[in-house]
Amino acid sequence: MKFAVILLFSLVVLAVASESVEEVRREIDIEDLPEQQRGCADLRQPCTEGDDCSCCGSEGVCNCSHPHKKGCYCKTAGPLEKLAKKFRGCKNK
C-alpha cells in the first residue's frame, strides 16, 4: 500500500514538473515575436514599456522594474493601478 501511495505521489510530482517546463518554453516563444504580434500580453509575459494597455484585461499592468528579469513584463495590478488603467481608457481584449 505504501509503495502504491509513493508511486502515485511521484507521478503527480512528475506531471506538475513537466507542465512548468512547458510554460517556460511558451514564454520564450512569445519573447521572440515582434512587438506588433505581442501587443496583447498575458500576465508574466513581455509588454510594451509605458503602455499598461498592452497588458490585456483589467488585472494587468506593465512593470519594467522587476528585480530578477530584464525588460518589461505584465504583472497583476493593485487596486489603484486598476482604477488608473480604467480611466486611461484601455480596451480589454
UniProtKB/Swiss-Prot annotation:
Tissue occurrence: Expressed by the venom gland.
GO terms for MF: toxin activity
Subcellular location: Secreted
Post-translational modification summary for this protein: Contains 5 disulfide bonds.
Keywords, sorted A to Z: Disulfide bond, Secreted, Signal, Toxin
Position of the signal peptide: 1-18
GO cellular component: extracellular region
Primary location: secreted
Maturation propeptide residues: 19-38
Family note: Belongs to the neurotoxin 31 family.
Protein name according to UniProt: U12-lycotoxin-Ls1b
Organism, as annotated: Lycosa singoriensis (Wolf spider)
